[in-house]
Amino acid sequence: MGKTVEINPTTRHEGHTKLVLKVDDDGIVEKGNYLSVTPVRGFEKFLVGKPAEFAPIAVSRFCGICPIAHATSAVEAIEDACGIVPPKDGLLLRELTGLGNKMHSHPLHEFLIAPDFIPEKDRVEYITRIQQMRKTGQYIVDTIGGEAIHAPNIKVGGMLKSITPSAVSKIYYKCKEFEKLAKEQVEYLIPIFENRTLVDGTEIPEKLGYHDFGYLATDSTYGNRENIEQKKVHEYTPYDVYEKEVAVQACQLFQEYNGRLMEVGPRARFAKFHDFKEKGAMAIHIARAYENVIHVKRAMEIIEELNVDGLTRAKDPILGDGEKLGLGVHEAARGHNTHQASIDEKGRITYYNAIVATTWNIPLIGKAVEAHYKFAEHVVRAYDPCVSCATQHDILRL
C-alpha cells in the first residue's frame, strides 16, 4: 500500500529543507520531493531602486558560506549592464578571492560528512587537516577581499585595491601548504568513497543518486557568461513540480536549461571540463575532493601572473539605460550561479534576479533520492546544498 515518509529537517548542510517521500511497502522511494522551508527574505525586491553599488553588499548577505560568489556575480551583472570592463589585475584579484572562498567551502563540506564516512580513530587528524585548509581559504579572502566573509573590496569595476608583495608571498606559501593537504585529502577520501561503505558498515547502493539529467557549468574555476545562453533558462514554480500540499510549503523557484533539468557543481564542472564519467552520489564527493587541488593550482597560477602595481578598478560611471539586462556568471562552490541586473541612467537598480546554484539542484535531488528512503539524506548531503542562498522568492496562489 505504501506510505509517505517526511524527513524534516534534513541535516548537515546550510539552510532548512525537508524531504517528502512516497515509498512502497519495501521502503523504496517512488516519488521524492525535496524542498526549501527556509523563510523567504526577498533580496531581489528590496534591491530595486537602490544604488547599483549596494547590490554586492546586500547579496553577500544571502548566507555566510557563499558571499564571494554572490558579490562577484552581482558586480559582473552590473558591469555587463553598464558596459564596464574591469582591468586585468582587478579580475585576477577577484578570481583569486573566489578561489579562496571555494578553498574554504569544499573542506567545510568534507567536515560535515565526517560522521558518515570517517572512522572515529581518524577524525582528529582528518579534521585538523580540514581546518588548516579552511584557514588558508579564509586568509586569501580576508587579505584580498578585505574581510573573510562579507568582502568589501569586491567593487563594480574591479577590486578596491591591490595587495602588497609581502601578501602575495604569504598567500603563495599558504597555497603550497594547502596543495599538500589537499592531495593528502584526496589520497585518504577517494578510496572511502569508491568503497561505498558508511562508518557503521552499511553499504551504499552502487547506483544511489543516479540520474539521466544534464550538466551545466560555464568554466572550470571561475565563470563565463559566454558559455551559457540565458534565453534557454526557464524558471518555474513549486506548483509546476509538486502536488499542491507539498508545493504550498516550498520557498524556492526551479530552473531548466533548454527544457531539461541540469545538475550544477563539482561533478558538472568535471564532466564538462575534465571528461569525468562517474555517476551517483559518491561521484560528487570524489569530484569535490579533486577540485580542492584544481582550485589551489589555479590560485598559484594567478599569483604568478598578477601585477600588484597594476590598475585594479575601472573608473567608468556606473550608469545604464534601464533596459539592458546584465548577466553575471560565477562558478560557486555549489555550482553555476547567475545574477541578472538592469541599471538606469541614474545608477539605480531597476531589476534584479539571482538564479542560485542550489535552485538548479533542488528538483534534481528530489528525483535522485529514488532508492531506499534511509539513504535519501546521503544524496542530499552529496550536493552540499546552500538553501539560504536558494530562497529568495515566495509564490502565493489563492
From Swiss-Prot:
Cofactor list: Ni(2+); iron-sulfur cluster; FAD
Top EC category: oxidoreductase
Annotated catalysed reactions: oxidized coenzyme F420-(gamma-L-Glu)(n) + H2 + H(+) = reduced coenzyme F420-(gamma-L-Glu)(n)
UniProt entry tagged with the keyword DNA-binding: no
Record Gene3D superfamilies: Cytochrome-c3 Hydrogenase, chain B
The keyword Oxidoreductase is annotated on this UniProt entry: yes
Entry GO MF terms: coenzyme F420 hydrogenase activity; ferredoxin hydrogenase activity; flavin adenine dinucleotide binding; iron-sulfur cluster binding; nickel cation binding
EC nos: 1.12.98.1
Binding-site residues for Ni(2+), renumbered to this chain: C63, C66, C386, C389
This protein's UniProt keywords: FAD, Flavoprotein, Metal-binding, Nickel, Oxidoreductase
Domain of life (superkingdom): Archaea
Family, as annotated: Belongs to the [NiFe]/[NiFeSe] hydrogenase large subunit family.
Function: Reduces the physiological low-potential two-electron acceptor coenzyme F420, and the artificial one-electron acceptor methylviologen.
NCBIfam families: frhA (TIGR03295)
Subunit structure: Complex of alpha, beta and gamma subunits.
Name this polypeptide is given: Coenzyme F420 hydrogenase subunit alpha
Gene: frhA
